């Protein structure tokens, strides 16, 4: 692993990294039970990647190219993700609160002739928390997710041209911080109530970081 700090003494963070893994024998690590800081015998994948990260103030930009080799396979053992680009920016307004935008585009080639290209856009809105006269702490958050993709020779995705999907969810959470005091101790607890609503066609987001 080679890392180059390009943002040293600069008003931003900039890092370029190269990672390479190679072996002359597909079963060498497992046969000899090699475990070091760089190699784990239980890991059957070799990873080679180039990564560039840039961050300044409320904006970040990542570019990555990756190649994977599955040592357990004799054919279709390679997987490529190129490019893999992520851009994100955070906004804040006294009136509307926090707004986080993230966009990611990547192209994947795996199992020989399978291809997927994704463009994902996420918009997360959080106006902040507010306390009612009765002491309830309320929080509202909303997210809009736009997924665009093309797939070829896959069975788990649609392959009929460019697919566009749009989903949204809004969340309301309310809690009541309470304290129980004794002469020698005190305990705090907060009963919490949460409601989520996803208008339109619902799509599983369990693998995504939602709230």
Question: Can you describe what each PLM-predicted range is?
Answer:
Residues 1-211:
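Outer-membrane beta-barrel proteins and related beta-barrel translocases across Gram-negative bacteria
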């Amino acid at each position: 692993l080679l890392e180059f700090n390009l943002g040293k003494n600069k008003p931003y963070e900039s890092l370029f990294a190269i990672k390479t893994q190679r072996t002359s024998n597909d079963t060498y690590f497992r046969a000899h039970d090699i475990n070091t800081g760089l190699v784990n015998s239980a890991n059957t994948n070799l990873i080679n990647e180039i990564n560039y990260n840039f961050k300044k103030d409320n904006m970040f930009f990542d570019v990555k190219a990756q190649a994977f080799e599955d040592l357990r396979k004799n054919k279709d053992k390679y997987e490529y993700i190129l490019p893999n680009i992520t851009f994100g920016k955070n906004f804040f307004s006294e009136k509307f609160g926090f707004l986080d935008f993230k966009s990611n585009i990547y192209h994947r080639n795996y199992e020989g002739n399978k291809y997927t290209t994704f463009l994902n856009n996420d918009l997360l809105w959080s106006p902040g928390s507010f306390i009612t006269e009765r002491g309830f702490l309320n929080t509202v958050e909303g997210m809009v997710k736009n997924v665009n993709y093309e797939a070829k020779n896959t069975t788990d995705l649609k392959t009929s041209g460019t697919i566009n999907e749009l989903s949204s969810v809004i969340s309301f959470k309310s809690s009541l911080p309470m304290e129980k005091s004794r002469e020698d101790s005190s305990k705090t607890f907060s009963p919490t109530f949460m409601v989520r609503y996803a208008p339109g066609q619902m799509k599983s987001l369990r693998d995504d970081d939602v709230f």
